[in-house]
Amino acid sequence: MADVSILNKLRQQLALAGVDALLIPRGDAFNGEEVPPADERLAHASGFTGSAGLGIVRNEDAMLFSDGRYTLQMESQKASGWDCATMPEVMPEDWLLTHHRNNSLGFDPMLMPLAAFRRMEKKLKTGGITLVPLDHNPVDAIWPDRPAPPVRPAFDFDEAVAGLTRQEKITAMIDAMGDDSETETPRAMLISDPAVLCWLLNIRGRDLDHTPFVLAFAVLSAEGMVTVYGDDERFAGVSQSGLVVQPAAMLMNDLAALKGVVLVDPTSCPVALHKVIKARVIEAENPAVLMKARKTPNERAAFIATHQTDAVAMIRFLHWFDQTLEKRPVRETEIDAALINFRSDAADFLCPSFATICGGGGNGAIVHYRALPGQDQVIPKDSLCLIDSGGQYRQATTDITRTVATGTPPAAMAQAFTHVLKAHIALATSRFPAGTTGVQLDALTRAPLWQAGMEFNHGTGHGVGCCLSVHEGPASISKRGMRVIVPGMILSNEPGFYVEGEYGIRIENLVHVAKDETTNMLMLETISLAPIDQRLIIAALMTDAEIDWLNAYHHRIGDEIGPMIRARGDADLTAWLEAAIAPISR
C-alpha cells in the first residue's frame, strides 16, 4: 500500500517542476488497460490497483478517480491523504474546474494520448487551467525501487490461424492509408497501439502478464516496410520479412526526420511523439483497429475450437469447486490457482487473459475485485460466488463469468440471478439490422432488469482480441457504445446485478456477430460453453422461450463438450456434468 510520505515527496516534485498540481494516469506510453509493473505509477502513489483510473495531486489535497467498477475498491485501497470519486458522476475536469481554477497542471506527455489531451485542454481552458508537459515523470523520481521495463522475446502467430499473411495485412493497411486524405496520400503511418503492431506483423509477445503484446512503437512506410523500435533480441525469433528493428532510443529522431504526410491515430499517439513529428500529420483512427475486430473465418474457427478447450477446463473447475466446498472451506485465492491448473492442461495455453475476479458473498459486489493472498476471505456458505476468468491460448482468447451457489442461498439471490439470466438471454437471442450500435443492444439487454427495478454499473459487452487484449475496441455494448456492431466481431454478453456488502451476480459468455440468413438480420452466436448454475434459477419467472434457450444451450454443451469430458474416464465428473445440464421446466 502507498505511503503518505509519497504524497509529501510528490508535492516537493511539484515545486521543483514549477506546477501547481500533477496528473497521474493509470497507464503507460501505449495507453493500454494492462501495464507492466514499471508503469504502475498510480498504484505506487495512491495504493489503488484497478485497471482504470487517474490521480490528481495538489499541495492541498489528492484526488483519485475511477469508474463504477472500482468504487468500492478505491475506498478500500486508497492510501491516507487521498479522497476518491466515481466517474462519470464526478469527472476529473469538472473537479479541477471547481477546485483548481487559474492554476497549472503538470503531466507526462508520453502518458497522455493526443485526443485525450485535447479534450482535457479544451475544457480546462474555460477555467484558466494550463496543462504543462513535463520533461520527466515526478513519480519515477521518487520511486527508487521501480521495476525494470520488460524485455521479453516475441514469437510468431500462426498465419494459418490469422487467415491473412503479414504481407496481405501490410498491403491492406497501405491501401487504407489513403482513405483519410482527400489530397496527398500519407507516406508513413505511426503505429502507437501494440495490438495493431502484433496483429499487423502476426506476432505476439510476453511483455505483459495477461496480454500477449510486444510493447513497442513502429512506423509503416508506404513502400511496405515496418520499422519497429525496440531491443533486437526481442524480435530475433520472429519472421524478419518486411521488418526492420531499430533501438528504441532512435524513435524520436526518426519521427522528426519523416517527410511528406504521416498518419497518426490520436487516440493512441502520445502527445510527446506527436510533438516531434515535423511532417504534415493526418489524424485518423488506425485502419487496423476495425480490421482486427472483424475476425477472419480462420480466426472465428480458432475461437470456437479454443472455447471448446476452455469449456473442458471450466467444467472440471466447476466440478472441483462444488466437490471441494462440500468437504472443506475454500479461500478466494484458491480459485485462481485452480483455474490456472485446469487450463494449463491444454498444450496451447499461454496465461490467464486477466487477473481472475473471484468474490464470495459481499466481495462479489466489487465488480473487478481481486483476491490477494493474506487479504482474501473464505467463500461463505449459503451465498453466491462470482468467478470471472479467462485464458490466453496460442489461437484465441477466452473470457467467461459464472456465478455459482455455495450451498442454499436465500430466495432473493435466486430471484436476482434469474433476472440477470433473462437479460443475458435477451441479448443472446436478439436479431438486429445492420447499422445497429452498441448502445442500442445495451438497452435491449438491460430491459428485463429495468422491468424488475434492477440495474448494473458497467458495460454489457466488450470486444475480444484473437490472442490479443481481452478488452478490444472499437465497439462495445454499453451506454457509451456508439460504434456500429458488424459481422465478424467477437463480443462479450455479461449483464449483472450487485448488492453492496451482500453479493454480486454476472453471467458472461462470448458471442460472435453473424448474419441470420432467415431474417436478413444480424444475430449473436454464443461460443462460450459452461453450465449455468440451475440451482439459482426460478423457472416460474422465465418465459417458455427463455427456458427453451437455456435447455438448448445446455444440450449443446452435452453434444460438443460431453464426449471430451467422458473421454477423461472420470465417472464422477461425467455424472456432475449430466446433472448440471439436465433440462429444466416449470
Residue ranges and their predicted role:
Residues M1-R586:
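Active-site neighborhoods and metal-handling regions in enzymes and metal-associated proteins
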